[in-house]
């Protein structure tokens, strides 16, 4: 019997993922996902003031893997407190202390007291979320998307020259209402239990779609590209539930009036009102937690204005989301799971004897391998944003097949050399060919992203594996429309 001698404190070698472990993962999908939701811009604080980020950044722990991990740790002798995930959040600089997030008993937490001072000269920054378990086992450090620092909302008539402050059709926004500028009275548009409501605790991210003025009301509607301007017809669709409000016309707010003739681009942190189209001056309004219709009053001396109440004035801001998914395929690991690689696109190169797939994304490292289903592919690391791999032959999935007879779709995942599986939500499809071409190892790739967003212009492959792009300016979107109480 051979004994393996190790020095004291030396870590055991990492376990490589087995084919069987990958099959179990693909069957059960017990992922652990960290979501960081935040605004795309943050207002700077001057002197001793603290302008807390609004809406507050929010961290969600999603996926069945968190519960399974907790149960596994408790089976291995950990107490309930030791198996509890802990998190701290900060703005990525050493001057400001990180703030603890309270995740006990729930899967989300908001960071309500983050701010950036004028002594911090950065024009952009990223939130940093440090996570570990109660027994001090490290989970890792997760970064948000990039946040732009602004001094204050632009009062000037906005132009498209400042495109990064404008709001494009099809992007996500949050809407909040603050009575008499009091922070404690802030309420956010949110969907819960199939209803729109004004929440003081959670905020929703809504797709804002630009519609043609003559688009009729319906669950299906055609959206337009371009930046949102005041006076245009828009549709707000919850990015989580798909629920939508009726057609709205977005109007600029000046003091307590809605301007009927404003047509400049909508900008970050502007106050705006939403007129319910084809109604008698009805506006989207909150009354405590309820979302209602409020009837505006015409201004007798100014026909281009309508008087609204405070509850119908909403502040608009673009939002973003960083999403990190991982799974311990060979059991617990000693190293943090971060940096979590994120794959943004796939591109098929070549054909014939060897087809190569190029992966573009972020946080790639040399210790990653690409897997097609339960088949590990030969992988070449290029840099932190690019990897190449050899597409496995179809016979690896369909024994005896020398060419593709019907479409075969396999998930694409990245696997670290210690067995950590990083799901990509992308798939590779072997597509049929008109006749036998035994030397072609891959007929084509089709990228599918499992998201609730409006699909981007998709790439399609023909039988030779080359790409044809189908692009269109309009996209059909299906939603379920909610009625607003009058």
Swiss-Prot record:
Gene3D superfamilies, alphabetized: 2.80.10.50, Immunoglobulins, LAG1, DNA binding domain
Protein encoded by which gene: RBPJ
Protein name as annotated: Recombining binding protein suppressor of hairless
Oligomeric and partner information: Interacts with activated NOTCH1, NOTCH2 or NOTCH3. Interacts with MINT/SHARP. This interaction may mediate the recruitment of large corepressor complexes containing proteins such as HDAC1, HDAC2, NCOR2, SAP30, FHL1/KYOT2 and CIR1. Interacts with EP300, MAML1 and PTF1A. Interacts with RITA1, leading to nuclear export, prevent the interaction between RBPJ and NICD product and subsequent down-regulation of the Notch signaling pathway. Interacts with SNW1. Interacts with CHCHD2 and CXXC5. Interacts with BEND6 (via BEN domain). Interacts with NKAPL. Interacts with ZMIZ1. Interacts with RBM15.
Function: Transcriptional regulator that plays a central role in Notch signaling, a signaling pathway involved in cell-cell communication that regulates a broad spectrum of cell-fate determinations. Acts as a transcriptional repressor when it is not associated with Notch proteins. When associated with some NICD product of Notch proteins (Notch intracellular domain), it acts as a transcriptional activator that activates transcription of Notch target genes.
Assigned GO CC terms: cytoplasm; nucleus
Primary subcellular site in the record, as a coarse category: nucleus
Cysteines paired by S-S bonds: none
Species of the source: Pongo abelii
Region (DNA-binding): 43-53, 151-156, 178-183
Biased composition (Polar residues): 451-467
Biased segments, Low complexity type: 468-486
Compartment list: Nucleus; Cytoplasm
PANTHER family reported for this sequence: RECOMBINING BINDING PROTEIN SUPPRESSOR OF HAIRLESS
GO MF annotation list: DNA-binding transcription activator activity, RNA polymerase II-specific; DNA-binding transcription factor binding; RNA polymerase II cis-regulatory region sequence-specific DNA binding; sequence-specific DNA binding
Keywords: Acetylation, Activator, Cytoplasm, DNA-binding, Notch signaling pathway, Nucleus, Repeat, Repressor, Transcription, Transcription regulation
Pfam families: BTD, LAG1-DNAbind, TIG_SUH
Region of interest: Disordered: 451-486
Post-translational modification N6-acetyllysine, affected residues: 161
Keyword hit for DNA-binding: yes
Domain of life according to the entry: Eukaryota
Gene Ontology biological-process entries: positive regulation of transcription by RNA polymerase II; positive regulation of transcription of Notch receptor target
Domain IPT/TIG: start-end pairs: 341-431
Family in the record: Belongs to the Su(H) family.
Keyword Acetylation among record annotations: yes
């Amino acid at each position: 019997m051979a004994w393996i001698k190790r020095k004291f404190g030396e870590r055991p070698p990492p376990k490589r993922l087995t084919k069987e472990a990958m099959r179990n993962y693909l069957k059960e999908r017990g992922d652990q996902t960290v979501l960081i939701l935040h605004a795309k811009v943050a207002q700077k604080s001057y002197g001793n003031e603290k302008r807390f980020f609004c809406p507050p950044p929010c961290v969600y722990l999603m996926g069945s893997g968190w519960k399974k991990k907790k149960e596994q740790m408790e089976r291995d002798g950990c107490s309930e407190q030791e198996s509890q995930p802990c998190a701290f959040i900060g703005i990525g600089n050493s001057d400001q202390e990180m703030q603890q997030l309270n995740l006990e008993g729930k899967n989300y937490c908001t960071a309500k007291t983050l701010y950036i001072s004028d002594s911090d000269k950065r024009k952009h920054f990223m939130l940093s979320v440090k996570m570990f378990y109660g027994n001090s086992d490290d989970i890792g450090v997760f970064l948000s998307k990039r946040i732009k620092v602004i001094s204050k909302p632009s009062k000037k008539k906005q132009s498209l020259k400042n495109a990064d402050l404008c709001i494009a059709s099809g992007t996500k926004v949050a809407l909040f209402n603050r009575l008499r500028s009091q922070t404690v009275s802030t309420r956010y548009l949110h969907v819960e239990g199939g209803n729109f409501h004004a929440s003081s605790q959670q905020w929703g991210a809504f797709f804002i779609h630009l519609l043609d003025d003559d688009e009729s009301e319906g669950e299906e509607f055609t959206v337009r590209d371009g930046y949102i301007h005041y006076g245009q017809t828009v549709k707000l669709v919850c990015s989580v539930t798909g629920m939508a409000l009726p057609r709205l016309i977005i109007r600029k707010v000046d003091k307590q009036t809605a301007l009927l003739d404003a047509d400049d681009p909508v900008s970050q942190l502007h106050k705006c009102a939403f007129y319910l189209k084809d109604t008698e001056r009805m506006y989207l309004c909150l009354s405590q937690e309820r979302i209602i219709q409020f009837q505006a009053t015409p201004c007798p001396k100014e026909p281009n204005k309508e008087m609204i109440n405070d509850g119908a004035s909403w502040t608009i801001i673009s939002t973003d989301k960083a999403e990190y998914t991982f799974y311990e395929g060979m059991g617990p690991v000693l190293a943090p799971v971060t940096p979590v690689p994120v794959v943004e696109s796939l591109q098929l190169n070549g054909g014939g004897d060897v087809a190569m797939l190029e992966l573009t994304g972020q946080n790639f490292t040399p210790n990653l391998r690409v897997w097609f289903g339960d088949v590990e592919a030969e992988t070449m690391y290029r840099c932190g944003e690019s990897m190449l791999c050899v597409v496995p032959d179809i016979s690896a999935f369909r024994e005896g097949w020398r060419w593709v007879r019907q479409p075969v779709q396999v998930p694409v995942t990245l696997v670290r050399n210690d067995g950590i599986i990083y799901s990509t939500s992308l798939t590779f499809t072997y597509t049929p060919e008109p006749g036998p071409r035994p030397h072609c190892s891959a007929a084509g790739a089709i990228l599918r992203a499992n998201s609730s967003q409006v699909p981007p212009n998709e790439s399609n492959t023909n039988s030779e594996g080359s790409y044809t792009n189908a692009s269109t300016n309009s996209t059909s979107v299906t939603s379920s429309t909610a009625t607003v109480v009058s």
